């Protein structure tokens, strides 16, 4: 079964010939898991964008061993792809703050005339996972505040329309940043992508900031989603077929692609429904104070 790597190898059309889509977004949302600190400058340096295909030191990009072979295959496929030949990056930010329970990482991609701001999901640190659990009773968490700050700063330096997105917690950050960015930015944002990203507390969906940007959200989850069904979700969800099982479906490398799009399912798997119902019952029966304990 084909994957995002196959798509990067086989889809040769430019985004002008074949518009940017959910699969493209997931690819960029996967690349943000790489360590760009040795190649891409932070926002404060105001340096030029760097072409992705100029990077040849793969070991420096890979700071952890998870999915190492697949990550290298994706890097090579994107670098060799006519569709992504003009992919550039800038404004890399990577923050780990144990004291304030903050894990945040973002980068800005430019593909031809398109600007895509990608937020990283939870990494394998205790700080990252602790912040995820804090979302059950607290909003905003530090990473959400950083996402708004980052979007506001980057948009000040760049003109034109914006796309924002991320995988896992990165999808949640993309939505939250779009909700609370400057009002003019809300109209500049063309699309918001959440790939198996957790939802929000119920009251968020009733707020005006959410309602303003709700129609721009594209949320995708795998059939046995767990992370993407955490907390409440109001968006219309597109369910993607996966070639793995259980929690391993969360990995973007396992999502099935065919004919330049995801392969979609009509409903989530039984195990996903059970987990979703259990979490919903817990949220309905507890208060923020009790969840914090």
Which residues are covered by each model-predicted region?
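Short glycine-enriched nucleophile-adjacent loop
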Residues: 174-183
């Amino acid at each position: 079964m084909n994957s995002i790597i196959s798509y990067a190898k086989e889809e040769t059309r430019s985004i002008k010939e074949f518009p940017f889509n959910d699969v493209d977004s997931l690819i960029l949302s996967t690349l943000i898991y790489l360590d760009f600190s040795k190649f891409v400058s932070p926002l404060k340096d105001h340096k030029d964008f760097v072409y992705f295909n100029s990077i040849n030191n793969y070991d420096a990009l890979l700071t952890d061993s998870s999915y190492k072979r697949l990550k290298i295959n994706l890097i090579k496929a994107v670098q060799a792809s006519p569709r992504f030949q003009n992919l550039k990056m800038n404004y890399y930010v990577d923050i780990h703050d144990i004291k304030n329970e903050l894990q945040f990482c973002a980068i800005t991609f430019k593909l031809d005339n398109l600007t895509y701001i990608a937020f990283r999901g939870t990494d394998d640190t205790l700080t990252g996972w602790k912040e995820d659990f804090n979302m059950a009773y607290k909003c905003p968490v530090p990473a959400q505040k950083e996402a708004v700050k980052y979007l506001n700063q980057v948009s000040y330096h760049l003109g034109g329309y914006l796309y924002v997105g991320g995988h896992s917690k990165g999808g949640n950050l993309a939505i939250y940043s779009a909700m609370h960015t400057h009002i003019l930015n809300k109209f500049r944002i063309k699309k918001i992508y959440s790939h198996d990203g957790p939802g929000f507390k119920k009251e968020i969906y009733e707020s005006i900031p959410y309602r303003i940007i709700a129609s721009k959200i594209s949320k995708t989850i795998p059939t046995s989603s767990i992370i993407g069904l955490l907390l409440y979700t109001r968006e219309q969800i597109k369910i993607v077929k996966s070639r793995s099982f259980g929690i391993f479906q969360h990995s973007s490398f396992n999502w099935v692609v065919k004919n330049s799009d995801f392969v979609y399912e009509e409903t989530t798997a039984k195990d996903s429904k059970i987990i979703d119902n259990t979490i919903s019952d817990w949220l309905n029966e507890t208060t923020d104070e009790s969840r914090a304990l």
